[in-house]
Amino acid sequence: MEEEFFENEQVKKFEEMIENNEEYYFSSEELEDIIVHYLELGDIAFAELAVNYALRLHPNSIEIKTKRLEILLEQQKYTQVKELMVELRNSSMETMDFLVCCAKYYSNLGNPRRAIEYCEKALKYGEEQNFLHNFIA
């Protein structure tokens, strides 16, 4: 409950910043939570605003770049997805979020075998096994 309140406060602060055309500092973790909030709502436009701002503040954050990957997948910008996957591959092959993004990419392009390979790798690292089993099915 306290974490949800904190997250909502950060989202309010971010929206206030956008509305007032100001710039506030957020940690990379706070921005990641804000991006996740918008992704869960399906508000890709605000998720993209948040990820672009996050990358300006934290340009080397692997987690933020992975969130950018999720947004690009939602926007079906597959050329950019592939480029970012190549950039992140060496540093992210053991993170579930990255592996799930790779699985979605190959699934969306009609390559289910490759998608399943990435899902199987993700099963080794993630707690979301039900999601992954459903994704494979």
Question: Where are these predicted regions, by residue range?
Answer:
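Start-of-helix register in tetratricopeptide repeats
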Residues: 29, 63, 97, 131-132
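Residue at a conserved register position within TPR or TPR-like alpha-solenoid repeats
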Residues: 37-38, 72, 106
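Structural register within alpha-helical repeat arrays
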Residues: 33-34, 68, 102, 136
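Conserved structural position within tetratricopeptide repeats
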Residues: 55-56, 86-90, 121-124
